[in-house]
């Protein structure tokens, strides 16, 4: 009990000392040259509007113990930039909109104290620090609106219960916006699609009706089988030679041929059949009448093209 209580009492003093050290570090002027080697134990790069740290090299300052990167608009803290800072004890990155803190910083050493704004971006770093460090230290974070320091663990438990970072929160917000757009636009798109399908079906129906009307104008083709007297019961069986009759495919203009050969059959017993060819040419069609011995022999057939 004594250790944590003493640490809680000493932490404000340490923060005050850190602030005193920071104030004693003058801000470096001029252009930032990351290839330059620094031999100072305290480096103050605050307010330099760096926005981004080098991704492929470390700061050349092996003796630095306090590094102030506050108020720069930084969003990422890559491990590669701090890799060679073996003496670093205090890293100040307040007043930056961080959305990524490399969790490898927690493995750099339990003696490194990180001062940052309260943010869910600290979750991975804090988790690894708790796993690797068992000291009585209580990491703190700065509440920017009030300027007060809070327990980082409590803040993460309350504000980031599911481990949401800014990137995850942004992704969820974007997904919600997309679902909202789909919910609004979905019924409209479905209505337009159904209307388009109905218009297509209606057009096909009209086209089929027009085709049937135009097809009805084609000339029918006729076949006739003359009326013959019924043979008596004792009539000998018919010859095995099949009977054929010409069927003329063409316009019914040759009606007078019926008048010369035979009188037209009565309408009550007529049957009609049409033979439809793709070339619409008149040509004789032969059919075997032997299979029609069971039906009256005076039938005529008429078929309308297209039916």
Swiss-Prot record:
<feature type="glycosylation site" description="N-linked (GlcNAc...) asparagine">
    <location>
        <position position="44"/>
    </location>
</feature>
<comment type="function">
    <text>Plays a role in the inhibition of RLR-mediated type I interferon signaling pathway by targeting RIGI for autophagic degradation. Interacts specifically with ISG15-associated RIGI to promote interaction between RIGI and the autophagic cargo receptor p62/SQSTM1 to mediate RIGI degradation via selective autophagy. Plays also a role in the inhibition of NF-kappa-B signaling pathway and inflammatory response by promoting the degradation of p65/RELA.</text>
</comment>
<dbReference type="Pfam" id="PF13855">
    <property type="entry name" value="LRR_8"/>
</dbReference>
<keyword id="KW-0325">Glycoprotein</keyword>
<keyword id="KW-0433">Leucine-rich repeat</keyword>
<keyword id="KW-1133">Transmembrane helix</keyword>
<feature type="transmembrane region" description="Helical">
    <location>
        <begin position="169"/>
        <end position="189"/>
    </location>
</feature>
<feature type="glycosylation site" description="N-linked (GlcNAc...) asparagine">
    <location>
        <position position="151"/>
    </location>
</feature>
<feature type="region of interest" description="Disordered">
    <location>
        <begin position="205"/>
        <end position="249"/>
    </location>
</feature>
<keyword id="KW-0597">Phosphoprotein</keyword>
<feature type="modified residue" description="Phosphotyrosine">
    <location>
        <position position="286"/>
    </location>
</feature>
<feature type="compositionally biased region" description="Polar residues">
    <location>
        <begin position="232"/>
        <end position="243"/>
    </location>
</feature>
<dbReference type="GO" id="GO:0016020">
    <property type="term" value="C:membrane"/>
</dbReference>
<comment type="subunit">
    <text>Interacts with RIGI. Interacts with SQSTM1. Interacts with p65/RELA; this interaction promotes the degradation of RELA through autophagy.</text>
</comment>
<keyword id="KW-0677">Repeat</keyword>
<keyword id="KW-0732">Signal</keyword>
<feature type="topological domain" description="Extracellular">
    <location>
        <begin position="21"/>
        <end position="168"/>
    </location>
</feature>
<dbReference type="GO" id="GO:0005737">
    <property type="term" value="C:cytoplasm"/>
</dbReference>
<keyword id="KW-0472">Membrane</keyword>
<dbReference type="InterPro" id="IPR001611">
    <property type="entry name" value="Leu-rich_rpt"/>
</dbReference>
<dbReference type="InterPro" id="IPR032675">
    <property type="entry name" value="LRR_dom_sf"/>
</dbReference>
<keyword id="KW-0812">Transmembrane</keyword>
<protein>
    <recommendedName>
        <fullName>Leucine-rich repeat-containing protein 25</fullName>
    </recommendedName>
</protein>
<feature type="repeat" description="LRR 1">
    <location>
        <begin position="63"/>
        <end position="86"/>
    </location>
</feature>
<feature type="glycosylation site" description="N-linked (GlcNAc...) asparagine">
    <location>
        <position position="132"/>
    </location>
</feature>
<feature type="topological domain" description="Cytoplasmic">
    <location>
        <begin position="190"/>
        <end position="307"/>
    </location>
</feature>
<feature type="glycosylation site" description="N-linked (GlcNAc...) asparagine">
    <location>
        <position position="95"/>
    </location>
</feature>
<feature type="glycosylation site" description="N-linked (GlcNAc...) asparagine">
    <location>
        <position position="56"/>
    </location>
</feature>
<dbReference type="InterPro" id="IPR039243">
    <property type="entry name" value="LRRC25"/>
</dbReference>
<keyword id="KW-0963">Cytoplasm</keyword>
<feature type="repeat" description="LRR 2">
    <location>
        <begin position="87"/>
        <end position="110"/>
    </location>
</feature>
<feature type="compositionally biased region" description="Low complexity">
    <location>
        <begin position="211"/>
        <end position="226"/>
    </location>
</feature>
<feature type="signal peptide">
    <location>
        <begin position="1"/>
        <end position="20"/>
    </location>
</feature>
